[in-house]
Amino acid sequence: MLNRRHLRIKILQVLFGYYQDEERDVVRARKALDHSTMKMKELYLMLLDMVASMQGLAIDRIEAGYKKKLPSPEDLNPNTKFVTNKPLRVLANSKNLRKACESTGVGWANRQELLRAIFKGMLDNEEYQEYMAIEERGFQFDRESLVRMFRKHMVNFDLFQDMLEEESIFWVDDLDLAASMAIKTIKTIKEGDEDVELLPLWRDDDDDKAFMEGLF
């Protein structure tokens, strides 16, 4: 969720634009602030959806191996450790995440090439290769490994960061907080969970939202 420091930064950004504008339209400035915070939520959902999408791409890769005219022994007996990662499966099958993405219009439908590039890069990533190579399993180990792959590869993938700069002026500044929220969400997944609980943009008592409106 948004913290006070991040809120102050957003407010200062909007106020700078407000005082640069000769008309100094308060209503428009408030809308800009609301838009900025909503983009933060969209980025958070996009990051979780990116992680969830990795499972489908991994499954596609395994199925493509089976269909080769001359499949290798690895193609015929693939390592399924990643696709059966339990926290990843919870994310991939999450109704809460799917509903939130649909309601906000967030998704990767128009960015499939980038998504595949992130996945292919992950296959060469040290964290992924170490995870696939060792025999250790267990829910906590799977969850910690997924977080490391996300933090050290997915969110830092160069083409992904380039996309953020092109898509929204807010996302580059929001990335660190959105990524920490995504990691916190993954860490809340417990063994036996059938769905993931998404973090709210504001605290339950709504103090932060009132704080933002009061400062502005």
Language model: regions and residue ranges:
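Class I Rossmann-like S-adenosyl-L-methionine
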Residues: 1-216
